[in-house]
Regions:
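Sec-dependent N-terminal signal peptides of Gram-positive bacterial secreted proteins and lipoproteins
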Residues: 2-22
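Exported/periplasmic ABC-transporter solute-binding proteins
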Residues: 19-310
Length: 310
């Protein structure tokens, strides 16, 4: 009799459990993948698409999955915090605990893995200055050269590292070099250096500007970041003499062939940055390969189940 009662109780419990989780509700595997990307001028997009093996999509929307969503770095971060079926990509320096960062080819996106070259999905942070003789006055020219030297110093490398990227050089302390730039010994509080270009580099650029100012006569700094392409246009390109001109422009991709008309000495790399595929925190996926990401962005994988069962 006790066995019969126990069996009946177990059947009742299973029945109640089935009723509490209706089988007609689609699971996560049936969710359509919502694909987010940067626009074609973005250095983040260029680095991501080339890194996953889908270079055709670096500057061409027509090869992407139908219905993709174009957004900037901050908007993609915000979207992944709420869109449980979304996927996008951002700079490692932008990643926080509101989203889930995916490993790439089984390797986590960390500064150590960028340095030891095991994390392959990365791109350069580069910068360009105005040409010699293309400054309002010599003070602005000398301040620009001093800033580039500061970025390359150990002090600059520390600022870059604190913002999540990996500096490519450390030439010694700024204190040991500042004497090479007499302009820094004078009061520069009436002078403004203008910075622009990649918005992925913005946090680093702002931090470098803030650290450089008191180290070089309290020069004023202004950061206005609108994309990697503008890093060239407003410094050496078609907008260099317009209202949006800049002294220094940043790019989160190597400058393209058509942007290399100026001398090599006007360009330099300041850091490497990992690019990270990101999803909602509740997404069960934790790692994707380049092939899987390519299939998602091509539209060959349209459901999360395609990825999970791959």
């Amino acid at each position: 009799m006790k066995k019969i009662v126990l069996l009946f109780s177990m059947i009742l419990m299973l029945t109640l459990a089935a009723c509490s989780a209706p089988v007609d509700e689609p699971g996560f595997e049936a969710e359509k993948i919502n694909v987010y990307t940067r626009d074609t001028s973005s250095g983040t997009r260029d680095g991501f698409m080339r890194g996953i093996g889908f270079a055709d999509a670096s500057a061409n929307d027509s090869v992407l999955v139908a219905g993709f969503i174009t957004a900037d770095n901050n908007a993609i971060m915000s979207a992944m915090a709420t869109d449980k079926a979304g996927i996008g990509y951002v700079s490692l320096s932008s990643v926080n605990n509101t989203i889930k960062a995916l490993s790439f080819e089984g390797v986590a996106a960390t500064e150590a893995n960028v340095l030891n070259d095991t994390y392959k999905l990365k791109r350069p942070f580069v910068m360009m200055r105005r040409l010699d003789g293309d400054y309002v006055n010599d003070t602005e020219y000398q301040l620009t050269l001093a800033f580039l030297a500061y970025v390359a110093s150990n002090d600059g490398a520390d600022v870059i590292a604190n913002k999540g990227a990996t500096a490519v050089s450390g030439t010694g302390t700024w204190a040991s070099q500042v004497a090479n730039f007499p302009v820094c010994a004078q009061d520069n509080s009436a002078v403004t250096l203008k910075f622009g270009g990649s918005d992925s580099v913005q946090k680093i650029a702002e931090a470098l500007s803030a650290a450089f100012s008191p180290a070089c006569g309290n020069v004023k700094t202004e950061n206005d970041h609108t994309g990697s392409s503008d890093g060239y246009k407003r410094v050496q390109g078609t907008e260099k003499d317009g209202v949006n001109y800049k002294h220094i422009g940043y790019s989160s991709r190597f400058f393209r062939d058509e942007e290399l008309s100026g001398p090599e000495a006007t360009r330099t790399q300041l850091a490497w940055d990992a690019i990270v595929a990101i999803v909602h925190k509740d997404n069960p996926v934790s790692n994707l390969t380049g092939e899987q990401l390519t299939k998602i962005y091509k539209g060959e994988y349209t459901l999360w189940g395609d990825v999970i069962t791959d």
